[in-house]
């Protein structure tokens, strides 16, 4: 709302409805997928580092099984949660085809410890991106943008800078998984 009545930098045009479009693109098309994939990569890394007990790595298939086991009546909130969470997990899995192939190979190989160590060595440098693409950096940039009354900076930062980090992180992680799959 704050951006709505402000002028677009270096022009005499007000943001108006453009502010809603800009913020919607930043939030729905950039922030949401970036955060979900960053979370997924972090959970994958923790899974390979600490095992199932040290990670919250969930699968679409497991969430659907839980959903199907719930009673049809009297479990509205549970069904709503697991339905949405299953979709969330499915979106993560669909965006990581190389990891899915690698993970199936690793599971089928009696959980090869050398392969696990190689994965962790390749995944560790990408963890800085998972941390940057979650809350802290966003909060700092949003805070600075609001304090300086240059709120347009935040959605553009989200769309340009954070998306570039996301693309790099995603590409590198998938390449790592493809190398290890061979």
Each language-model region and where it sits:
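Multi-pass membrane catalytic core of lipid/isoprenoid biosynthesis enzymes
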Residues: 1-34
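C-terminal membrane-associated helical module and adjoining short loops/tails
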Residues: 30-182
């Amino acid at each position: 709302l704050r951006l709505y009545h402000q002028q677009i930098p270096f022009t005499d045009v007000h943001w108006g409805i453009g502010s809603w479009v800009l913020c919607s693109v930043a939030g729905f098309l950039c922030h949401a997928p970036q955060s979900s994939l960053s979370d997924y990569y972090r959970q994958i890394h923790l899974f390979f580092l600490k095992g199932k007990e040290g990670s919250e790595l969930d699968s679409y298939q497991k969430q659907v099984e839980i959903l199907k086991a719930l009673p049809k009546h009297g479990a509205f909130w549970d069904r709503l949660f697991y339905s949405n969470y299953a979709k969330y997990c499915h979106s993560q899995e669909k965006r990581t085809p190389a990891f899915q192939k690698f993970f199936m190979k690793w599971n089928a190989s009696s959980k090869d410890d050398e392969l696990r160590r190689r994965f962790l060595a390749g995944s560790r440098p990408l963890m800085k991106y998972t941390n940057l693409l979650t809350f802290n950096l966003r909060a700092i940039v949003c805070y600075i943008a609001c304090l300086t009354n240059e709120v347009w900076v935040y959605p553009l930062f989200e769309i340009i800078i954070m998306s570039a980090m996301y693309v790099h992180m995603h590409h590198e992680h998938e390449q790592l998984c493809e190398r290890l799959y061979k």
